Swiss-Prot record:
It is found in: Cell inner membrane. GO terms for molecular function: 4 iron, 4 sulfur cluster binding; iron ion binding; NADH dehydrogenase (ubiquinone) activity; NADH:ubiquinone reductase (non-electrogenic) activity; quinone binding. This is NADH-quinone oxidoreductase subunit B. Belongs to the complex I 20 kDa subunit family. Pfam families: Oxidored_q6 (PF01058). One of its GO terms (cellular component) is respiratory chain complex I. Binds 1 [4Fe-4S] cluster. It comes from Enterobacter sp. (strain 638).
Length: 224
């Protein structure tokens, strides 16, 4: 089977991604102001219930590319117990999963396969890029490695590290849950706006900037 790789253009109107209209807004709830009190409250309650179910039942697709996958699987052990976040149900088929974790080095031969698997996932679906290699190619700045999986699929959460610890993966799940809780997706094909609205989430680097600048006493790794 021949595979073709399509480069993603976030600003492209006719690009293959997203298949639905997506728009980054400061607060999706601001659109509820122009609605009536009753319908606005009812639709808001329905969105809260649907998003609560989605963010607490994230089913990841079980596949890995490199050493970061080992750290991802470690989070499923009893020591870390990722079942607390509702993400312990590994799926062997992309059609039954709603989360793709690209863990490890993405080679150019594997990129079309990942893109095809992403296309086979049903909406709503999310992507976590785990590790420096998946984020930006890592130390492999060569012709055979894709310099970031966001070159061909959209990414929701980036996990830095080489490799990241299981705790970093669980923190990424919590960040993804916060983002899913603020999303506004169509409740039905006949109910409300058919667009997909995602909140503009603040990066962890910006959120912790003030805390890091205020540090005056640098501790050794043994004291942390």
């Amino acid at each position: 089977m021949d595979y073709t790789l399509t480069r993603i253009d976030p600003n492209g109107e006719n690009d293959r991604y997203p298949l639905q209209k997506q728009e980054i807004v400061t607060d999706p709830l601001e659109q509820e102001i122009n609605k009536s009190v009753y319908m606005g409250k009812l639709e808001h309650a329905m969105h809260d219930m649907v998003n609560w179910g989605r963010k607490n039942s994230i089913w990841p697709y079980n596949f890995g590319l490199s050493c970061c996958y080992v750290e991802m699987v470690t989070s499923f052990t009893a020591v870390h117990d990722v079942a607390r976040f509702g993400a312990e149900v590994l799926r062997a088929s992309p059609r039954q999963a709603d989360l793709m974790v690209v863990a490890g080095t993405c080679f150019t031969k594997m990129a079309p396969v990942i893109q095809r698997l992403y296309d086979q996932m049903l909406e709503p679906k999310w992507v976590i890029s785990m590790g420096a290699c998946a984020n930006s190619g890592g130390m492999y700045d060569i012709y055979s490695v894709v310099q970031g999986v966001d070159k061909f699929i959209p990414v929701d959460v980036y996990i830095p590290g080489c490799p990241p610890r299981p705790e970093a993966y669980m923190q990424a799940l919590m960040l993804l849950q916060d983002s899913i809780g603020k999303e506004r997706r169509p409740l039905s094909w006949v109910v409300g706006d058919q667009g997909v609205y995602r909140a503009n989430m603040q990066s962890e680097r910006e959120r912790k900037r003030g805390e890091r600048i205020a540090v005056t006493n640098l501790r050794t790794p043994d004291e942390i």
